Amino acid sequence: KIEPDSAFGRHPPEVLPSPDEAADFYLYAVEHLEHHGYRQYEISNFAKPGYEGRHNLIYWDCGDYLGLGPAAHSCMGGRRFYYPADTEAFLNDKAAPVMDGGCGAEDYLILQLRLRKGLDLAAYKARYGKEFSTAQLAFVKNCVKSGYATFDGSTLALTPAGLIVQNSILAELL
């Protein structure tokens, strides 16, 4: 979706690629970048080995992080919260943090499948006590057959083609 108030929305191109063309462009970009030594480590991030953006990995792994200031988001001890964006209220100590839940099993699954390393099912079970159902495993098998995922029995990872349709895959797994 193109947001109407964004620069792109205010000055849209005359022609946009079709969804199929956009997918082809994405797959070409993945191949081109990997050919030049940039490894895709997350749905929209590439880096040379050892130069991955570590700061984002804490979010994808549902780790603890502390944000300070107006509009800052934090996750501590599995509980997420944020401060309202009102700077005046924050400075006057009138901005109470707003709780918005924690990083539960669904969040973890969604965030781990953003990463090319994928979801370690043993870690998922250890952390949340959840295992994939027979129906979910059958769906995973179909994703592998279709070239959307790899699954070695312990780790489920989406391929570049799978990352394109990640939302549809997640809808089936959740």
Label every PLM stretch briefly.
Residues 161-174:
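Short, amphipathic alpha-helical interaction segments positioned at domain boundaries
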Residues 1-130:
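C-terminal scaffold of the Radical SAM
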Residues 43, 135, 153-154:
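Residue-level detector of family-conserved "landmark" positions at structurally sensitive sites
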Residues 155-159:
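Minor-groove-contacting beta-hairpin "wing" of winged helix-turn-helix DNA-binding domains
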Residues 144-154:
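A short, conserved structural fragment
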Residues 129-144:
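Short amphipathic alpha-helical interaction segments
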